[in-house]
């Protein structure tokens, strides 16, 4: 008997405009349909665009499932099937917060629905905002506690500006979703963390905060969103540390297409597949600028994987 279906994440919000917002969530199954119900009595429905971030893997350094020590389950990198679902809600009213709920249908027609949350499009100018500026979570010990305190202090958070280094190794799926130490990226920002800290003989479990279910997140690429040469048989840690410039890869391997050059040099594919990024006619750029209320947010792509001791 198959285990019951469940969501891999709660829904989260991205890139609101004055009349729209994107709702995103993840599962470990492709499914037969995924949708967002929203509005009065949840009577309106939008179906999703679905993709599989194909570089997500686990390896001997993962802490996921029953693997609590190095190499207990995974001796080398193993691909993990994870699906991203994105619905674009349009024709929203500025300043009006409405209810929404996500649903997914499995291949056997089993239906699962999430909790009901609220969303709204981008705030109008002149409205006071509470914006969380954060960075460098990287499954660090204090993240869940800090985010729990944020939510206890500010009942309403309007947006999250994330200045890079969201996880430690971007192609390691469990760092985003379900590290068994309880402090993966999404659980901490969605109030589902279970990170235990011990102080003065007392154990306390910190759960992070329910933040990005109702406040859009605007991410930025840091050096920990960049992976190196792909699928080399090395550990994910070694791949992360194996970046080389594209022109060097071209000289070494003679690769002509962008995809093959990325495999032989560096890439930000997992970051770009996990988050919605604004696009122009040539596709995603990794950098962007948006207006959010009275704030003009400019996000650069200036991370440097190659460090020098004199800079």
Give the residues covered by each predicted segment.
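Metal-dependent phosphoester/phosphodiester hydrolase catalytic core
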Residues: 2-311
């Amino acid at each position: 008997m198959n285990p019951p279906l469940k969501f891999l994440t709660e829904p989260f919000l991205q890139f609101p405009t004055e009349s729209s917002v994107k709702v995103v969530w993840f599962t470990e199954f492709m499914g037969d349909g995924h949708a967002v119900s929203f509005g009065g009595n949840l009577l309106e429905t939008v179906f999703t665009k679905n993709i599989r971030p194909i570089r997500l893997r686990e390896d001997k350094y993962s802490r996921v499932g029953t693997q609590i020590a190095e190499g207990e389950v995974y001796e080398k990198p193993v691909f993990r099937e994870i699906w991203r679902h994105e619905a674009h809600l349009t024709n929203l009213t500025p300043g009006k917060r409405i209810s929404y709920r996500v649903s997914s249908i499995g291949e056997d027609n089993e239906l699962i629905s999430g909790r009901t949350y609220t969303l709204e499009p981008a705030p109008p100018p002149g409205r006071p905002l509470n914006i969380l500026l954060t960075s460098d979570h990287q499954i660090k010990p204090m993240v869940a506690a800090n985010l729990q305190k944020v939510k206890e202090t500010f009942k309403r958070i309007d947006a999250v500006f994330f200045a890079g280094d969201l996880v430690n190794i971007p192609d390691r799926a469990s760092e985003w979703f379900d590290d068994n130490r309880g402090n993966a990226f999404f659980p901490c920002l969605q109030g589902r963390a279970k990170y235990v800290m011990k102080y003065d003989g007392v154990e306390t479990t910190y759960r992070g905060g329910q933040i990005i279910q109702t406040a859009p997140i605007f991410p930025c690429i840091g050096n920990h969103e960049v992976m190196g040469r792909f699928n080399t048989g090395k550990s994910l840690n070694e791949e992360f540390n194996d970046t080389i410039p594209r022109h060097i890869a071209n000289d070494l391997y003679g690769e002509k297409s962008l995809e093959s050059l990325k495999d032989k040099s560096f890439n930000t594919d997992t970051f770009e597949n996990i988050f919605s990024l604004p696009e122009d006619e040539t596709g995603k750029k990794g950098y962007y600028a948006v207006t959010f209320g009275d704030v003009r947010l400019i996000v650069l792509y200036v991370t440097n994987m190659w460090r020098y001791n004199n800079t």
